[in-house]
């Protein structure tokens, strides 16, 4: 992934302090080509309420679908929020998360939404193990986007990259079907132009 500024940058790039740390390994996933605007791709990545319904047994637990309360705050141009929420236990096919609990595991997520169409997500499970998602959606045009994802973790050092890549391919394909059906293709600034259920 290459960032280019044709003029003086308006904002700094997101600070990912785990980059360069030898205890972290990094996996490139995607790219993910969608027939949807980048705003939809990013919106989907920040919406954890759909996990139990769209990704049951992978990201969400259908027996614990309620989204706990959380607070959204801004820090300059960055939107931040933290949430502790139910997570599905690891599966035999995709043992990608560091949750030790096989019964009702919980996950702490720290979200940072940056402009343009960029997300930095830190995951934790209460111990030293952690995971970092760095997602950027490239607008191709008003109705198409290309998502790039880099994931870092400080555990599962011997696990082949393909396990995490295949997991993300499954997740993104499940989301793609739904997001590509949403109208308008671009997230409207006027919330009355959409029906939220």
Predicted regions and their residues:
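Active-site-proximal cofactor/substrate-binding loop regions of enzyme domains
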Residues: 1-3
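C-terminal catalytic domain of Rieske-type non-heme iron oxygenases
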Residues: 9-197
């Amino acid at each position: 992934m290459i960032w280019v500024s044709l003029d003086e940058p308006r904002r700094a790039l997101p600070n990912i302090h785990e980059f360069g740390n030898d205890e972290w390994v990094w996996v490139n996933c995607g790219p993910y080509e969608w027939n949807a605007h980048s705003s939809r791709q990013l919106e989907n990545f920040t919406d954890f309420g759909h996990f139990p319904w769209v990704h049951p047994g992978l990201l969400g637990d259908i027996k614990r679908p309620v989204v706990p309360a959380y607070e959204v705050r801004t820090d300059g141009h960055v939107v931040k929020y933290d949430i502790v929420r139910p997570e599905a236990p690891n599966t035999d096919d995709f043992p990608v998360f560091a949750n030790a609990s096989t019964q009702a595991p919980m996950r702490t997520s720290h979200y940072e939404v940056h402009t343009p169409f960029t997300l930095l997500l830190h995951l934790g499970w209460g111990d030293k193990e952690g995971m970092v998602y760095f997602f950027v959606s490239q607008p191709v045009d008003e109705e198409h986007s290309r998502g790039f994802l880099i994931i870092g973790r400080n555990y599962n050092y011997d696990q082949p990259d393909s396990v995490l890549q295949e997991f993300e391919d499954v997740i993104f394909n499940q989301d793609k079907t739904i997001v590509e059906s949403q109208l308008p293709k671009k997230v409207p600034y006027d919330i009355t132009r959409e029906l939220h259920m």
